[in-house]
Amino acid sequence: MSRKLEALDRRKARVRRALRAAANGRPRLSVFRSSKQIYVQVIDDVAGKTLASASSIDKALKGELKTGADVAAATAVGKLVAERAKAAGVTKVIFDRSGYIYHGRVKAVAEAAREGGLEF
């Protein structure tokens, strides 16, 4: 494995360890970003189930996104996952940035989810 991927895995493990300690039973809002898309899930770690999810390739966002890899797409995905989480009865989450720095698309997802009504 390359050094960059190993470093990402170490950061991800470190972030998840801190989240597990601070979660207090709250579901986590997990972000995965690739070079072309962004994916967000609300996961209940106690039950091991995904409560809500959204991505830039979602059918609900099909016509309105120019690309799945920009801040505008991340904002739309954040709003969509907030709607779906509220419909599933989730209002408080803990944000899992998955080892990515809190900047750009990751920050846009978090801010849009907050605007959509999720608390973290």
Curated annotation (Swiss-Prot):
Keyword rRNA-binding: yes
Annotated keywords: Ribonucleoprotein, Ribosomal protein, RNA-binding, rRNA-binding
Source organism superkingdom: Bacteria
Alphabetical list of SUPFAM superfamilies matching this protein: Translational machinery components
Biological process (GO), any one: translation
GO molecular function, one term: structural constituent of ribosome
Coiled coil stretches, renumbered: none
GO CC, one annotated term: cytosolic large ribosomal subunit
Any matching Pfam family: Ribosomal_L18p
UniProt KW Ribosomal protein keyword: yes
HAMAP family: Ribosomal_uL18_B
Assembly and interaction partners: Part of the 50S ribosomal subunit; part of the 5S rRNA/L5/L18/L25 subcomplex. Contacts the 5S and 23S rRNAs.
Function: This is one of the proteins that bind and probably mediate the attachment of the 5S RNA into the large ribosomal subunit, where it forms part of the central protuberance.
Similarity field: Belongs to the universal ribosomal protein uL18 family.
Protein name: Large ribosomal subunit protein uL18
Taxonomic lineage from the root: Bacteria, Pseudomonadati, Pseudomonadota, Alphaproteobacteria, Hyphomicrobiales
Gene that encodes it: rplR
